[in-house]
Design a protein with these regions (language model features):
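Short, acidic/polar N-cap/turn motifs at the starts of alpha helices
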Residues: 60, 93-95, 119-121
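C-terminal helical cap and adjacent loop that interface with cofactors, partners, or active-site loops
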Residues: 49, 115-127, 132-135, 141-272
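Active-site beta-strand termini and strand-to-loop segments that position acidic
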Residues: 96-102, 126
Length: 272
């Protein structure tokens, strides 16, 4: 599985540099200057961790991180200070590899410095197929695998060497559209906010709180996703050595079986 936060922040760095004691946004470039590792890991890791049932039947066990040297980061600081930046800790590109207890591998990338199209990857590679969200959405399945999913291929030579044709992909997406998107998807597009994502997440938060349900993310998610920064820094500062993940669940990572969204009643699952 792969996830990433690749977002060229060139238009925003003037706002992300400290411009006084009361500057609320100015922490970011300074923080990158002082810290190695994936310092914005939640964007890439969160959805991947949920897809792989992390602490719901599996756990992240070992991490190895590597980064490029800083070129753009140093230039950004020098441009704003007029002085030489002798050390900028965060590399222009950071890659973190994680192995889980059940033998899965996760790759997470972080790059906010170099010119690239916006990308969060979200790639899942399984034994029966492949799914990719960024930079281009696509799914790769053999004809028999697509048929087994309930969608009949309209071409004779369908195989997993390329993405599904548009007709088959649309049919697959429609058949398996998530109930949360069925309810909030169109409204989210109208309201906006990061393409509607903000609205969907806020709506789920309100729904869970109103109905006394477990939230879609819990405190263990928070700890697991955020510790990637410190563990990656520890790995790279020690020659890109393997670093063990703490078990924040204290041995309970295999109690819950699979990631699930909570609903007030079973019949509400189809509409909420």
């Amino acid at each position: 599985a792969q996830g990433a936060y690749i977002h060229n922040l060139s238009p925003f760095w003037d706002h992300y540099w400290k411009n006084g004691e009361n500057d609320k946004l100015g922490w970011r470039l300074d923080y990158n200057m002082k810290h190695r590792g994936d310092v914005y890991a939640t964007h890439g890791l969160g959805p991947v961790a949920q897809a792989l049932d992390i602490h719901r039947g599996d756990r992240m066990e070992t991490l190895v991180a590597m980064d490029t040297k800083s070129v753009v980061g140093k230039e950004l600081v020098e441009k704003r200070t007029g002085e030489e930046c002798k050390e900028f800790r965060n590399g222009d590109h950071t890659t973190t590899m994680i192995r889980t207890a059940n033998g899965k591998v996760i790759e997470i990338q972080h790059n906010v410095m170099t010119p690239q199209p916006y990308n969060r990857l979200y790639q899942l590679t399984g034994t029966k197929g492949f799914a990719n969200k960024y930079p281009v959405e696509g799914y790769a399945l053999d004809a028999d695998q697509l048929s087994a999913s309930g969608v009949q291929p309209k071409v004779d030579d369908l195989n997993s060497h390329g993405f599904l044709p548009e007709t088959e992909m649309e049919a697959l997406v429609e058949k398996y559209q998530h109930p949360i998107l069925k309810k909030y998807g169109e409204m989210a597009k109208e309201v906006g906010g990061h393409g509607g994502m903000d609205f969907v997440m806020d709506s789920r938060l309100v729904y869970c709180l109103q109905n006394g349900l477990p939230l879609d993310m819990d405190v263990y998610d928070l700890a697991e996703w955020c510790c990637l920064a410190e563990l990656g820094e520890l790995s790279m500062d020690n020659g890109c050595a393997a670093v063990a993940f703490p078990d924040f669940t204290r041995g309970e990572w295999n109690v819950v079986k699979g990631y699930k969204h909570a609903y007030a009643t079973p019949d509400r699952k189809s509409v909420v």
